[in-house]
Amino acid sequence: MEINGRTGFFCLIGSPVGHSGSPAMYNYSFQKTEQDYVYLAFDVDLDKTEEAVSALKALGCKGFNVTMPCKTKVAELADELSDAAELIGACNTVVVKDGKLHGHNTDGIGFVRNLKEHGADVKDKVITVMGAGGAATAIQVQAALEGAKKIYIFNCKDKFYANAENTARKIENKVPGVTVEVYPLEDSQKLYEKIKERDRKSVV
């Protein structure tokens, strides 16, 4: 790959990023497709997120990926959010277009697409998800956006339980036709009942 005065750049921000395989993957892709871009990784702490994002815009960055701990802050800074990013309250991908930040969250999209490719479309299905962290929340939101009729969320009674309840409220307020129920993961009988309740149209 030959970098010149016209080479555009994309990047990853967050902390830590030294272990990330994204630069190798994207730079290989740019090279194979003969695109004049480079992908970098910048270690950015939460308190430096706004400053870093402003710098990326000023430098003409085409877009960037976001990892922890910056995802929520970047969602707050974005000019526009996709439906998923707005419901999740976090971004992992930002497209910079005409000086504006367009925030997306692709975690749930990837998971739900993989289900569909393997014959499990979530539309009109009953979904049971164990967990309420970032990835689980993204899956719950994307399942709702793609037409799931009911979502059961099970999570331990820890700091993420309130997040599960908040996600349920947001989904029901923003996505018509879907019901979301939250239960403690410690309630094994309830978990058994909800999984047993599911029919051939269900996904766990």
Language-model features and meaning:
Residues 201-204:
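Conserved small/polar residues in nucleotide/adenosyl-binding loops
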